[in-house]
Every structure is written in structure tokens, then in C-alpha cells.
Amino acid sequence: MLNDETAKPFVSLLAFDKEEAIGHILFTRVYFSDKEVSPMMHILAPLAVKPIYQRRGIGGMLIKEGLHLLQAMGSEVVFVLGHKEYYPRYGFATHAAHLGYLPPYPMPKESEVYWMVQPIGPTGYEVGKGNVKCCDELNRPEHWRNEESDR
């Protein structure tokens, strides 16, 4: 995704323990597919921490620092498709579609809770609403489906 022009500007952060990389987070650009002009918005994907370093707050530190850097860049809104109990601890609201932010691909109703949003700019939720489109690399159906949704 780092070579995908539609992902820019992006934020990529690594967490280290001495010289060993133990965690990574990436935020890439997203757009409203149904609008000619979109505010600067991003999606968090992926976040990974090596298993032996999990449950130590490393993922949370990466999220907080990433959101801080995005806010400084002028990003207005950040999305994530993830764990419904983890990401709300860092300010994400579940059911982003109910707030007017539709995911890139349709989701089963029971999965809508995992599509989340967090306004980080001064306009908050007034930034606009619409169908979210990810950078080209992430905007593939296989990234937005699971086995159950295919049945």
C-alpha cells in the first residue's frame, strides 16, 4: 500500500523493543465515492502486535500516536473495521453506517457493529456523509467479506 498513490498521505508507525520491531499500524487515505470532493479522511488497517507483546498497551499507543499525527496533518475522520470492544476504547464509535458513513462494500447486518468511525477534526461529524472508498489496494471485495457473508 505504500506505493499506492491513492493511499497518500498515509501514516505508518512501528513500535520497537530495543532493535526488534514488535508492532505496526498503518492509516491510509479514504474518500467519499459518491462525492466529487472529499475531506481528508483515513482508515486504520492494519494494526498488528507480536503475540508475546500483546496486552501491554502497545497497540493502544500506536493508535493514539497515529490519531495525533493524522490530526496534525488535517485529517477529519478515521475509520476502522475491527473488534467492537477494542477500538471504542480509543474513541471509535461502532455502527458507522448508522451515522451516515457506508462501508466500501455491503456488510451483513450482524457485522455492521464492526464498522467504526472517529471524528478527529474540528468539524466533527459535520464533515459530511457518504459511501467510503479506500485506496486502490484496500478497495477490493476480498478485504470486506467473510465466509459467513458469502453464504
Where in the sequence are the language-model features?
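Short loop segments at secondary-structure junctions
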Residues: 18-19, 52, 119-124
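Active-site rim helix/loop that mediates acceptor-substrate recognition in acyltransferases
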Residues: 1-31
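Conserved beta-strand segments that form the floor/walls of ligand-binding pockets within enzyme
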Residues: 14, 26, 43, 48, ...
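C-terminal "cap" of GNAT-fold acetyltransferases
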Residues: 103-150
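Short acidic (Asp/Glu) patches
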Residues: 27-28, 62-66, 96-102
